[in-house]
């Protein structure tokens, strides 16, 4: 199944009953693209959707235009929204905890998607994270995992009903001429271009990526690595890039990730953990060779259509990228395999239909 845009919202009264009322709860912007896609599809099927999220997420993703009522994520607003809902759907464990607290005293079913929540830290912080996961897993009527490892984790934490629910990414193809323009803008017309995309946080593995970049300095021509994303590690990464004269540019937050990936010779995903990596999906769809760490849900997602390396091994990462840069035929084979693999993923409509079937099932249980 290839990904396709969900249908635009149209008025409907499903099943001859009053419209189902849902609240989508976000704790940040990480799941916003998925929630906007889900909102569009649910609204098209006659579901009334309220999105409770940070104001900045509404400003960037415009849930209202997708057919939702937007409510800021203040505690009082969340409580009021949840009190009027038939189903509450939280995206992420922290959002799940906030939703569970807001629903205390109510019998409204809670659905929790765990996409984006990785392995817990060690020590006291890890114990606290484990406690949070157990509370949320037990509070949820259904837990949806974007990858099989997340489903397993939810079950270990006590989820009574945990299911695999892959998240489709909205297709955003870039025009061929845009790729050439992007290379020119980045200064990579006559040198290879490597692209990584994601927030500058520890689990993304960018320190390992910079270690690998030291080895690429000796290639002729030396590739340019660009990293699109923002986060707390920016200052430290910038200091390393300057001190070690690494062929790396930090681009900050970008809204044209698809355009950047279409321009790349190789996409790089060095993360410590990923459930259903957005970068991997966009790279394979765009027909760009991908080198990724063999972690989380990545192997399940990409199959044989990417080169996988161990996490935390800069030598293996550097060698894999160098080998692809030296072998255009192998890159072309991966590009073709990537498009074939991407065609097997659920579409946005498939994702909406699966989520709506869960909501309907919960409503039937309550009757």
Spans of model-derived segments:
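Short hydrophobic beta-strand element within catalytic cores of glycosyltransferases
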Residues: 289-292
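Short His-centered aromatic/hydrophobic patch
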Residues: 90-97, 114
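A conserved mid-protein helix/loop that constitutes part of the nucleotide-sugar donor-binding site
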Residues: 32-41, 192, 196-215, 232-238, ...
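Aromatic "clamp/platform" in nucleotide-sugar-dependent glycosyltransferases that forms part
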Residues: 272-275
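Nucleotide-activated donor-binding/catalytic signature segment of Leloir-type glycosyltransferases, i.e.
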Residues: 238-254
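N-terminal strand-loop element at the rim of the active site
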Residues: 15-76, 150-153
């Amino acid at each position: 199944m290839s990904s396709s845009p969900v249908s635009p919202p149209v008025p409907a009264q499903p099943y001859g009953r009053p419209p189902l009322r849902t609240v989508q709860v976000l704790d940040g912007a990480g799941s916003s693209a998925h929630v906007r896609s889900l909102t569009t599809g649910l609204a098209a099927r006659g579901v009334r959707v309220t999105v409770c999220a940070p104001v900045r997420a509404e400003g960037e993703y415009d849930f209202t235009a997708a057919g939702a009522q937007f409510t800021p994520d203040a505690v009082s607003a969340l409580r009021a929204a949840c009190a009027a809902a038939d189903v509450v759907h939280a995206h992420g464990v922290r959002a799940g905890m906030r939703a569970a607290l807001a629903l205390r005293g109510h019998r409204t079913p809670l659905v929790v998607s765990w996409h984006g929540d990785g392995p817990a830290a060690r020590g006291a912080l890890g114990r606290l994270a484990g406690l949070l996961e157990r509370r949320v897993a037990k509070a949820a009527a259904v837990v949806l995992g974007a990858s099989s490892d997340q489903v397993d984790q939810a079950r270990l934490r006590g989820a009574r009903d945990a299911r695999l629910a892959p998240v489709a990414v909205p297709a955003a193809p870039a025009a061929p001429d845009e790729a050439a323009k992007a290379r020119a803008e980045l200064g990579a017309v006559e040198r290879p271009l490597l692209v990584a995309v994601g927030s500058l946080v520890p689990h993304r593995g960018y320190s390992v990526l910079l270690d690998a970049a030291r080895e690429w300095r000796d290639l002729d021509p030396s590739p340019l690595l660009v990293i699109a994303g923002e986060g707390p590690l920016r200052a430290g990464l910038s200091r390393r890039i300057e001190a070690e004269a690494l062929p790396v540019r930090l681009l900050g937050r970008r809204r044209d990730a698809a355009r950047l990936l279409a321009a790349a010779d190789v996409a790089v995903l060095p993360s410590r953990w990923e459930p259903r990596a957005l970068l991997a999906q966009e790279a394979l769809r765009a027909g760009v060779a991908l080198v990724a760490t063999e972690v989380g849900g990545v192997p399940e997602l990409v199959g044989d259509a990417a080169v996988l390396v161990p996490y935390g091994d800069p030598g293996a990462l550097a060698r894999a990228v160098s080998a692809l840069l030296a072998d255009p035929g192998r890159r072309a084979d991966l590009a073709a395999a990537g498009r074939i693999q991407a065609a097997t993923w659920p579409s946005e409509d498939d994702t909406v239909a699966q989520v709506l079937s869960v909501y309907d099932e919960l409503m039937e249980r309550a009757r």
